[in-house]
């Protein structure tokens, strides 16, 4: 995924998961929404985000993608995947307690974000050899 915003969202989300992991009163859940023409559910991006969450949370150790007909277990991250309308893509993470809720949301408004990211990556990789991730591209911009 070549979205600059999503890459930054992933970094913010990782930090938030590490911080909020210390507060047992907050449960963690996530969801994604995409247009009704998208064939995969969950999306590759949602799968990547779920992996990041599990890698940085000591309380969540598995993802449940399907509909639940029971209470989620404490170690389960329930990640909902919705399809409908014309939504290019929205991914959200929620830390919820009895007292309050904190939500992090990234919404693609235009597919031009992917073109912008691809062009930035092409400029960045010029003269380099090897295999790189888009996260490495963004990492250099943040240094």
Where do the protein language model's features map onto the residues?
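C-terminal substrate-binding/catalytic lobe of Rossmann-fold NAD(P)-dependent oxidoreductases
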Residues: 22-143
